[in-house]
Each structure stands twice: as structure tokens, then as C-alpha cells.
């Protein structure tokens, strides 16, 4: 018969193995949050998209339901209207954003894979918010560089959400800080990166976790030292760092 310690270790192992979208060490506590306050208030269209995404082989890439709820409320609190999203996947966080912003709000959405986006697009269209989305397929950096060169986009975005290639987060930040307005927010997802940011370098990790770990650590250090922003790192989902531009 397993001891309590063995059971806890086994639960922790399963927690990591399934790529859990929460840093809570108790699966029961996370399920309580989802079943008590997230799923009962989740819009039907977001539930449908979440269930569609769950069948995709890369479903670990999606935004968690609790983080989607958080983003939706945050956007309403800051009255965001002109937004950007880098890294779309099937569009769960994109739909959360589209539902939160006003009818004439806009989202510039960028991802290297249109096929994944089109998996969720019928749900987005059925929700009546597809007209708010300008989707661009391809790398985001050239688009950002062109926007900065044009000049008219400086300080024009109320909110920007980044959930893409972690090895480019620093490069995104260098550009996005010019495009978000003073008082606007940038949200960087996965900044606690499966909890690996506090793990010893030789700790057992999945290959992709180990590969991106140093890039996430570099980003966190850079954001903490950037005088142009105020920051708040939250243990929601896989960690999200909010950056408010102050100068």
C-alpha cells in the first residue's frame, strides 16, 4: 500500500506529465477552481472551442480556461479596444479577447499556422466576433518592424498578449514597448514555464521545457529591470507577466 508521501509524489508526477495548465500542486484544488468559478461562467462558444481544441494533438499549447476568464475580465477592466495577439493557435484566448472588447474593437492576430486558427474559426464566426479579428499568417517580427517603420502605430495599442515562440520574447518586447500606449498593457504568457524557472539546471524536464527555460529566465530578468514598465507576475495558467507601460 502506497504511503502518503508516495501518493503525493505520484500525483506531482502526473501533474507534470500531462502538461497541466496550472502551477497549483493540487489537482483537486485546480479542479475546484475550474468547476466552481470558471466552467459555470464560461461562455458557450468558449466551451465549444475548448472542447474542439482538446481533440488536437498539440492541445497543451492552448490557453487554459481560467486564464481565458482572467484575460476577458482584465480587458473589460482596462476598457481595451485596440489589441494585438502574437501566437493564436486555435484561438481560445483570441475569442476571450474578442468577446471582451467593444463591437468596433480590433485585434491584430498573428500566427505562423493558419490551419490551427481555422480549426477554431467556425466557432469564432458563430459567436459573431470574427469581424473584430485581422489575422495575419507568418512570423510576427517583420510585421512589427514594418509597423514601427510606418510610424502611425506608435503607442496605438491598449493591450497586447504574447503566447508564442519563447526564444523571441525579448525581441518582441523591444518592439511592442513602442507600439503599446502609455498606460497600456502587454501580457507575456508562460513566464513560469512549467515551474522550471526554479528547478535546478540538471533536474529532469521535457526537452521543449529545457530548451526554452533559459529564454524565459532571460525575459523575466529583463522585464524586472525595464524602467519603462511596471510589472506583475501572476501564477495564473503557466504564469503570466503583465507589463504596464509608464514612459
From Swiss-Prot:
Pfam families: Methyltransf_3 (PF01596). SUPFAM superfamilies: S-adenosyl-L-methionine-dependent methyltransferases (SSF53335). S-adenosyl-L-methionine binds at residues 63, 85, 87-88, 93, 111, 140, 165. Gene3D superfamilies: Vaccinia Virus protein VP39 (3.40.50.150). Its cofactor is a divalent metal cation. A divalent metal cation binds at residues 163, 189-190. Substrate binds at residues 21, 163, 194. One of its GO terms (molecular function) is metal ion binding. The keyword Transit peptide does not apply. Its EC number is 2.1.1.104. It catalyses: (E)-caffeoyl-CoA + S-adenosyl-L-methionine = (E)-feruloyl-CoA + S-adenosyl-L-homocysteine + H(+). The keyword Metal-binding applies. Pathway: Aromatic compound metabolism; phenylpropanoid biosynthesis. Keywords: Lignin biosynthesis, Metal-binding, Methyltransferase, S-adenosyl-L-methionine, Transferase. It is an enzyme of class 2 (transferase). GO terms for biological process: lignin biosynthetic process; methylation. Binds 1 divalent metal cation per subunit. Belongs to the class I-like SAM-binding methyltransferase superfamily. Cation-dependent O-methyltransferase family. CCoAMT subfamily. Methylates caffeoyl-CoA to feruloyl-CoA and 5-hydroxyferuloyl-CoA to sinapoyl-CoA. Plays a role in the synthesis of feruloylated polysaccharides. Involved in the reinforcement of the plant cell wall. Also involved in the responding to wounding or pathogen challenge by the increased formation of cell wall-bound ferulic acid polymers. This is Caffeoyl-CoA O-methyltransferase.
Amino acid at each position: 500500500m502506497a504511503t502518503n508521501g508516495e501518493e503525493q509524489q505520484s500525483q506531482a508526477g502526473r501533474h507534470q506529465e500531462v502538461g497541466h495548465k496550472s502551477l497549483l500542486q493540487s489537482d483537486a484544488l485546480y479542479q475546484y477552481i475550474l468547476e466552481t468559478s470558471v466552467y459555470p461562467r464560461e461562455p458557450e462558444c468558449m466551451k465549444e472551442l475548448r472542447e474542439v481544441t482538446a481533440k488536437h494533438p498539440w492541445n497543451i499549447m492552448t490557453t487554459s480556461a481560467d486564464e481565458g476568464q482572467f484575460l476577458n475580465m482584465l480587458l473589460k477592466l482596462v476598457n481595451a479596444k485596440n489589441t494585438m495577439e502574437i501566437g493564436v493557435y486555435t484561438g481560445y484566448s483570441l475569442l476571450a479577447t474578442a468577446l471582451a472588447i467593444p463591437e468596433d474593437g480590433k485585434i491584430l492576430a498573428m500566427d505562423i499556422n493558419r490551419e490551427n486558427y481555422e480549426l477554431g474559426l467556425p466557432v469564432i464566426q458563430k459567436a459573431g466576433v470574427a469581424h473584430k479579428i485581422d489575422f495575419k499568417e507568418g512570423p510576427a517580427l517583420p510585421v512589427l518592424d514594418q509597423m514601427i517603420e510606418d510610424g502611425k502605430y506608435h503607442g496605438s495599442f491598449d493591450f497586447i498578449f504574447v503566447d508564442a515562440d519563447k526564444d523571441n520574447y525579448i525581441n518582441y518586447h523591444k518592439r511592442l514597448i513602442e507600439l503599446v500606449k502609455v498606460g497600456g498593457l502587454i501580457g507575456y504568457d508562460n513566464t513560469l514555464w512549467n515551474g522550471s524557472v526554479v528547478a535546478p539546471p540538471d533536474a529532469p524536464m521535457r526537452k521543449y521545457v529545457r530548451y526554452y527555460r533559459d529564454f524565459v529566465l532571460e525575459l523575466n530578468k529583463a522585464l524586472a529591470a525595464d524602467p519603462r514598465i511596471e510589472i506583475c507576475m501572476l501564477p495564473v495558467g503557466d504564469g503570466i507577466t503583465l507589463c504596464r507601460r509608464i514612459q
